[in-house]
């Protein structure tokens, strides 16, 4: 795993970051940190939708973060598809639920910023050689 990319993600998530889990990554291609990266992918998808809904004016920041994760990890085939599916699942879950920015949406954003940052730090600390 490329540590530089995770460090960048930690910095981008900003030290502050639900939804239902998407299907698990195929066992024969899974790395030991894939569960964390899958959850991070889902969080990035959720933030991509919710931050835009709440007027953050960040454009495609969270989609770009997902692309940075994919570029750093360079997964192929099923593993790549699973990360993308998790991102899309996070996005769609909130698209179906939130049509305007509410206090609850703001709370979800704060919690996801915290959780995403925590996942990125833990994966980096545990698997960075």
Listing of model-derived features with the role each one plays in the protein:
Residues 14, 32-33, 104:
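Generic detector of short alpha-helix boundary/capping microenvironments
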